[in-house]
Every structure is written in C-alpha cells, then in structure tokens.
A protein has these predicted regions:
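C-type cytochrome heme c attachment motif
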Residues: 2-7
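Short functional micro-motifs and their immediate structural scaffolds
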Residues: 10
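Iron-sulfur cluster-binding electron-transfer modules in prokaryotic oxidoreductases
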Residues: 15-229
C-alpha cells in the first residue's frame, strides 16, 4: 500500500507537510543553523570527484573499514561508526564508458517514448556503484534501446535540497537542464538509475520552478528505468 502524508491535496486541509518541513530547513540554512559537516557531505560533486582518483579512492575505502578511524570520525564529525559508507572507484564511470552504446540498434518509438535513452548516471552511479549503470545499459541494449551516456551532468541537487540550500539547488538545475535539453533535442529520453534523482526532475524541480518551460520539458522526457521498460 502507498504510504504518504494524509493531508496532501486534495484533502480539505491541503497541507503539504514534507514541503512545509523543507521550508523550515531552508530557513535554518539561511540563518546558518546547519552543521558544517552537513554542508560538506552534501557537496557531492567536489567531494566525490576528489575521492574518485587512483590512490585516494583506495585510501578512502580503507578508512571507511577501519574501526579506529570510524570511532574517531564519530567523535569528530558525528558520523556514526556503524553507518554504512559508500565504496569509491578510482576512476569515474563516465570516463570509462563510450559516449554511445548499442547505437546500431533499430530505434523503435512508442506513444510516450522516443526509443533512445540518455542515461544520467548520477553521483552514485559514477563514483560508487558503476555496475548498476552497466547492468541498466545491458538491459536497455537487450531490449533494443540504444544508449547515450551524459558526460557533463552535475549532481541532481537532492542532497542540497534536503539541507535546505535552495540557491545551490537552482545552480545545479541551471547546469543540468541544458545538458538534458540537448539530449532531448537529439531525440533521446532521459533515465537515471537512482529514484531520488528521478524524483528531482519529475517532481521537486517542477514544483520549485513552475513557470520554467525547460524544466517542464525535461520532466516530460524523464523516466524511471522500470517505468520506461
């Protein structure tokens, strides 16, 4: 069964509680009432890019599995010693994959889709779980769907949204929307393997920028992998 806030529209109270809490987070951020730790760990683009390099990735992974260092991290930064941390790869996936994969396949469009997919690999797919993206590509190619890898996209902005840093969310939106629009203009639909990243472009950004035609166009061409298949 679906679980959600019971007072969302069309309820007579029309209370969007999740976004009410988001407004509170944004106010806290504006008042500088957020931890520096949270400001750092939500800066995924510079942090992940710095770690996903030969030597550094291996050191970060070793540190994440070191009990003494995890205890120190809990004491210094408030990151629980038993909290799972992502494993980093020494080279981002977007630097390893070809730009176009399976482009020999015959394109078959449908009523809602073009039959070609541009994959927004996301921070997690690019730096932590590349196999997830590679498996998605294999499934799409198996079903006759040619794939393009979006090379220049930034973080979707969900970590900064949860922090309440709405200006940074807008900056990331401004960086990604042109990349997505270019792919759409070339006849591609957009897919991301991480549900929260899909949610940003299907729901959160359209709510934040209701009059933005490019955001609306990206929303119309953005799909969850299972929805697309």
């Amino acid at each position: 069964a679906e679980t959600k806030c019971p007072y969302l529209p069309p309820h007579e109270w029309a209370l969007d509680f999740p976004h009410l809490m988001l407004r509170a987070k944004a106010q806290n951020f504006e008042n500088k009432d957020t931890k520096w730790r949270d400001r750092i760990i939500t800066s995924t683009d510079p942090i992940f890019d710095a770690i996903s390099t030969p030597g550094i990735a291996q050191m970060a992974n070793a540190a994440a599995n070191s009990k003494p260092l995890r205890k120190a991290g809990q004491a210094l930064f408030g990151i629980h010693q038993d909290a799972p941390l992502p494993t980093f790869i020494p080279k981002p996936l977007t630097e390893s994959l070809e730009g176009y994969i399976g482009d020999h396949a015959q394109v078959t469009s449908s009523e809602k889709t073009t039959g070609k997919v541009a994959i927004f690999v996301t921070c997690y797919g690019d730096h932590n779980e590349p196999q997830m993206v590679e498996d998605l590509i294999a499934v799409l190619n198996h079903n006759g769907v040619p794939v393009k890898i979006l090379q220049d996209a930034k973080c979707c902005g969900m970590p900064k949204l949860e922090l309440g840093d709405l200006k940074k969310v807008e900056k990331m939106k401004d960086a990604n929307i042109p990349v997505f629009q270019q792919a759409i203009a070339e006849g591609y639909d957009i897919i991301a393997p991480i549900p929260s990243c899909v949610l940003m472009y299907k729901q959160e950004l359209p709510l934040m920028f209701p009059g933005h035609t490019d955001v609306a166009n990206v929303k119309a061409h953005f799909f969850d992998p299972f929805e697309y298949l």
